[in-house]
Swiss-Prot record:
Top-rank lineage group of the source organism: Bacteria
PROSITE patterns cross-referenced by the UniProt entry: RADICAL_SAM
Molecular function terms, GO-annotated: 4 iron, 4 sulfur cluster binding; metal ion binding; rRNA (adenine(2503)-C2-)-methyltransferase activity; rRNA binding; tRNA (adenine(37)-C2)-methyltransferase activity; tRNA binding
Protein family according to the UniProt entry: Belongs to the radical SAM superfamily. RlmN family.
Any Pfam family matching the protein: Radical_SAM
Protein's name in the database: Probable dual-specificity RNA methyltransferase RlmN
Length: 368
């Protein structure tokens, strides 16, 4: 059985080290600063998957690296590729737990959606991610490794495609794993490594107001998205348990602080649930709620991917989405209906992992 622990006993991934930490580790072990820069270059520019491929590093130091670290800690279990080019990956962690990562082809490039936790405790009643409660946080290396394996998948195709955008919107609440997510952001944004621009990275939160305030002060120029999904406290609390701890008044005070501090736009994610949150009245409430920050906010209307375990919910019909959208536009709200990806595979966040675990349990029963 996988171990439920945040302090695993396996060797850490070298991806867990920021560039400054790698330099400090190399110096501590008798090497010069430039040696760490060479290793960093091998990892993020040449993208090797083994220390033994680092041909300008001494055998003794490679042995030391192998003794203390692995390169990529993930094992690829399943890859599903959609007709629209979306690719969904199921990765196995060193302790046997499973996570999902999704590659989406956009008109502006390749965008990867990463997972930050094994399971989720936020408890949104419509979401596949929360079907399994949080087991543990991913460390920085395990989050970074998702990007590296997706990039490897495309490197092996030899077409020169490069991951250009990252969305931290996979399984888990990123701000509930704050330190590791922040290290991940700084690693992938490092100019000497993957050099993915901060404005090409989006972090999504379900609304941990105190962490939004903290994030505003980090000086990290990435984009912030907030999973809103309802325009009033009663409705939001009924579908998102987090609202009972951070009601809309607290959440929007934090969002206003973030905007004032960073002068950056916030995107609101709003999943369209038929007969639940998709009426014209709901749209007017949403327009009123966001009025004060209209110039620096944006609403993303999201078609719902049905989840069998949450069969009380269904996708809003096209005409209801259009009516909702029209109300927002008439009120001057910047909004868009999100383009769908991967509708012919296990598209909903957490679905591939959940379905695979079901199959694994069924196989185990048959084998008993």
């Amino acid at each position: 059985m996988p171990k439920k622990t945040d302090t695993p006993d396996y060797k850490p991934s070298i991806y867990s080290l920021t560039r400054d930490e790698l330099i400090a580790w190399a110096i501590e072990h008798g090497e010069k600063k430039f040696r760490a820069s060479q290793i960093w270059d091998w990892l993020y520019k040449k993208r090797v998957q083994s220390f033994d491929e680092m041909t300008n590093i001494s055998k003794d130091f490679i042995a030391l690296l192998n003794e203390n670290f692995v390169v990529n800690p993930l094992k690829q279990r399943i890859v599903q590729e959609s007709a629209d080019g979306t690719v969904k990956y199921l990765f196995e962690l060193p302790d046997g737990m499973l996570i999902e990562t999704v590659l989406m082809r956009q008109h502006y490039g390749l965008s990867v959606c990463v997972t930050t936790q094994v399971g989720c405790n936020i408890g949104c009643t419509f979401c596949a991610s929360g079907l399994i409660k949080k087991q543990r946080d991913l460390n920085n290396g395990e989050i970074t490794a998702q990007i590296m394996l997706v990039q490897k998948y495309f490197d092996e195709r030899g077409q020169g495609e490069r991951v250009s955008h990252i969305v931290v919107m996979g399984i888990g609440e990123p701000f509930d794993n704050y330190t590791n997510v922040l290290k991940f952001l700084r690693t992938v944004n490092d100019d000497n490594g993957l050099a993915i621009g901060a404005r090409h990275i989006t972090v999504s939160t379900s609304g941990l107001a105190h962490k939004i305030r903290e994030f505003a002060n980090e000086g990290v120029q990435v984009n912030l998205a907030v999973s809103l999904h309802a325009p009033n406290n009663e409705l939001r609390s009924s579908i998102m348990r987090i609202n009972r701890s951070f009601p809309l008044e607290k959440l929007f005070a934090a969002i206003e602080y973030y905007i004032e501090t960073t002068n950056r736009r916030v995107t609101f994610e709003y999943i369209m649930l038929n007969g639940v949150n998709d009426t014209p009245e709901n749209a007017q409430e949403l327009a009123d709620l966001t009025k004060k920050i209209r110039k620096l906010s944006y609403v993303n209307l999201i078609p719902y991917n049905p989840v069998s375990e949450h069969d009380q919910y269904s996708r809003s019909p096209k005409e209801r989405v259009e009516a909702f959208y029209d109300v927002l536009k008439k009120n001057g709200v910047n909004c868009v209906v999100r383009q769908e990806h991967g509708t012919d595979i296990d598209a909903a966040c957490g679905q591939l992992r959940s379905n695979t675990m079901k199959r694994d349990r069924q196989k185990a029963k048959v084998g008993q």
